[in-house]
């Protein structure tokens, strides 16, 4: 009798229109239920049965119902799925020929029914790593989730899984590109012959892709004439050639623990373009005077040249000699002169940057030592020493010169731009500074000079607490086609060109500098190019982090549940607890709030104040050093959980 009843249809329509509907992101939990977060302000409970229709990270619309004074979200429509392409582990069930896959994500625990694509011929075993794409979703009207395996990665127990799984996840290449036919072609470019000069290369002892060499002399007026020779792969790589397209697609050499995957074929990066000792190589050279006060002279110039590095020197050897440690000595008077004058250049420039720009506080670099099977044997700290600082100052000088020449002659290039504080959050910065006894004006902090003045003041603080608190209000560095300030370095413009073997952005700037030298026209880099460079840089950094997390988990797993203690620095404070970095090896671990104090209502972990309060009293702050032991290492998610010890 209710069939085709217009009153009933009207009632249904009325109920539908009166029901609140919202759009938001699904946040899963390990307990089966979830939440729908709307604009970061409001969240609605999603009960376990309704969570079966969605995944963590899905963007959906949902109807909001009230049950016993509790607002509950009922998923209705999918706007954007969280999972599209993903990596995971294949699962097989007893007496069942079907395959399932578990996505490699800490909050995605459920198996997804899957089948291999037609072109995938691998016979999958339990635990194999695979890459898949989602094909079905309950909110699209399908009966359940289903995926299609588009590729086999590696066996589940293979020790090289961290590398191959991570590279596949981020759609990064696994091998060096093959070398196409290409010849050195300078066209009408004239090169000055500098092969008689005593250029030296300072690098790691094992480095093959050497892209810089240095030469320096002292002028009669006390200034230093510094020549920075940079390898010139653009002599071999013509714009829009096959090799150029390969370099553009990769954009950067990918440095991972244990090995690297080059942007260019190794025949170029490690041989034809590498500034090897006693080898004549095409180069682009920047020449500039360093005045006695460290300022750069007005005589900076760029030109193409032939150079021959006379000596390959190792960072540690040069540092040992400069720091008066016994052992290595320069092999000739020429090398001694070069090292001595380069050290003088470094001191002048570093002192000038401390006074007129900014110098980063040095942090240790952690390096994994691996055996041939990919096992972590040790994690060592590589400190930045005297020779590293020489090369760093020379490269910064070269990049400053390029930024100025490109700006003055063309008005464009590939620039690294960092604009300091986020303008919408500047009032919060002022408030935090005031709480800690520093008076500052918002407008001044948004200018380069004001930012630099604040940074120098923060460097004088007894701890890094205040620096860490305001760092989260800063913008991210960007790759831009126009000149712009780099607040982090304290410069009004900064453009890199010193690593063209490893960075496509530097190849672009090489071509622009050559256009200036030859007085020819060159197009401004497009926004599309800048976006490609940004995305590939981000993917490479995430890959390095992901492989590192995996290796840290393997390295620390034997210490889980033992009494071994580690010194750790608090690097972040969240509502749920502390993120810490183990001082000896650099591993990131999490300390849950329940490990800090048993009574939850008496504990407050505040990211805003950068402190942990128990009963209203601060017990921990950002950058504090605490002792911990490893409570648990969750190998499936590569998460390390630590517990404080007295």
From Swiss-Prot:
Primary enzyme class: hydrolase
SUPFAM superfamilies to which the protein is assigned, alphabetical: Nucleic acid-binding proteins
One GO CC annotation: cytosol
Record-annotated RNB domain positions: 191-518
The keyword Transcription belongs to this UniProt entry's keyword annotation: no
Major localization class: cytoplasm
EC number: 3.1.13.1
Boundaries of every S1 motif domain copy: 563-645
Domain of life: Bacteria
GO biological process, one term: mRNA catabolic process
Molecular function, one GO term: RNA binding
Reactions that this protein is recorded to catalyse: Exonucleolytic cleavage in the 3'- to 5'-direction to yield nucleoside 5'-phosphates
Residues that span the membrane, as ranges: none
UniProt-annotated location(s): Cytoplasm
Keywords linked to the UniProt accession: Cytoplasm, Exonuclease, Hydrolase, Nuclease, RNA-binding
Function per UniProt: Involved in mRNA degradation. Hydrolyzes single-stranded polyribonucleotides processively in the 3' to 5' direction.
PANTHER family recorded: EXORIBONUCLEASE 2, RIBONUCLEASE
Family matches, as HAMAP family: RNase_II
Protein family according to the UniProt entry: Belongs to the RNR ribonuclease family. RNase II subfamily.
Listed name of the protein: Exoribonuclease 2
């Amino acid at each position: 009798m209710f069939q085709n009843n217009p009153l009933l249809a009207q009632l249904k329509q009325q109920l539908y229109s009166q029901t609140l509907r919202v759009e938001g992101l699904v946040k899963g939990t390990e307990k089966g239920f979830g939440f729908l977060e709307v604009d970061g302000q409001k969240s609605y409970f999603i009960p376990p049965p309704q969570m079966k229709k969605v995944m963590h990270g899905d963007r959906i619309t949902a109807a909001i119902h009230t049950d016993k004074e509790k607002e509950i979200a009922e998923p209705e429509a999918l706007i954007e799925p969280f999972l599209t392409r993903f990596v995971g582990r294949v699962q097989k069930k007893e007496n069942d020929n079907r395959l399932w896959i578990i996505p490699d994500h800490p909050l995605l625990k459920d198996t997804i029914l899957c089948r291999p694509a037609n072109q995938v011929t691998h016979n999958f075993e339990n635990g194999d790593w695979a890459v898949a794409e989602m094909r079905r979703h309950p909110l699209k009207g399908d009966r359940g989730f289903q995926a299609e395996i588009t590729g086999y990665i590696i066996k589940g127990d293979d020790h090289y899984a961290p590398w191959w799984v991570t590279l596949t996840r981020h759609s990064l290449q696994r091998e060096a590109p093959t070398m196409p036919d290409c010849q050195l072609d300078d066209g009408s470019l004239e090169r000055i012959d500098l092969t008689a000069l005593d250029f030296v290369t300072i690098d790691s002892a094992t480095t093959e892709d050497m892209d810089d060499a240095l030469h320096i002399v002292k002028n009669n007026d006390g200034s230093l004439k510094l020549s920075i020779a940079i390898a010139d792969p653009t002599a071999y790589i013509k714009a829009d050639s096959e090799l150029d397209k390969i370099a553009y697609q990769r954009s950067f050499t990918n440095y991972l623990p244990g090995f690297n995957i080059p942007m260019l074929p190794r025949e170029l990066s490690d041989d034809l373009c590498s500034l090897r000792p006693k080898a004549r190589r095409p180069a682009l050279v920047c020449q500039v005077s360093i005045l006695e006060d460290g300022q750069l002279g007005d005589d900076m110039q760029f030109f193409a040249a032939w150079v021959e590095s006379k000596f390959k020197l190792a960072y540690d050897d040069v540092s040992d000699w400069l720091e008066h440690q016994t052992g290595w000595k320069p092999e000739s008077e020429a090398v001694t002169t070069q090292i001595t004058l380069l050290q003088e250049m470094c001191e002048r420039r570093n002192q000038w940057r401390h006074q007129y720009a900014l110098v980063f506080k040095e942090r240790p670099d952690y390096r994994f030592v691996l055996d041939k099977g990919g096992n972590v044997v040790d994690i060592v700290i590589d400190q930045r020493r005297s020779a590293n600082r020489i090369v760093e100052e020379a490269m910064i000088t070269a990049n400053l010169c390029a930024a100025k020449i490109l700006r003055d002659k063309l008005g464009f290039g590939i620039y690294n731009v960092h604009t300091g504080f986020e303008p919408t959050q500047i009032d919060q910065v002022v408030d935090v500074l005031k709480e800690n006894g520093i008076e500052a004006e918002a407008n001044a902090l948004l200018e380069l000079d004001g930012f630099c003045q604040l940074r120098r003041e923060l460097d004088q603080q007894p701890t890094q607490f205040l620096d860490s608190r305001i760092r989260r209000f800063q913008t991210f560095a960007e790759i831009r086609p126009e000149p712009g300030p780099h607040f982090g370095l304290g410069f009004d413009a900064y453009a890199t060109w010193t690593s063209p073997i490893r960075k496509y952005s530097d190849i672009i700037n090489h071509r622009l500098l050559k256009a200036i030298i030859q007085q020819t026209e060159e197009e401004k880099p497009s926004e599309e190019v800048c976006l490609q460079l940004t995305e590939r840089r981000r993917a490479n950094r995430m890959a390095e982090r992901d492989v590192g997390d995996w290796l840290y988990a393997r390295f620390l797993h034997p210490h889980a549940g033992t009494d071994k203690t580690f010194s750790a620095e608090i690097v972040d404070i969240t509502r749920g607890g502390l993120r810490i970095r183990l001082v000896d090896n650099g591993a990131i671990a999490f300390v849950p709030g329940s490990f800090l104090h048993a009574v939850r209502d008496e504990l407050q972990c505040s990211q805003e104040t950068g402190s942990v309060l128990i009963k209203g009293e601060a017990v921990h702050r950002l950058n504090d050093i605490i002792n911990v032991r490893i409570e648990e290492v969750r190998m499936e998610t590569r998460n390390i959980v630590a517990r404080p010890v007295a």
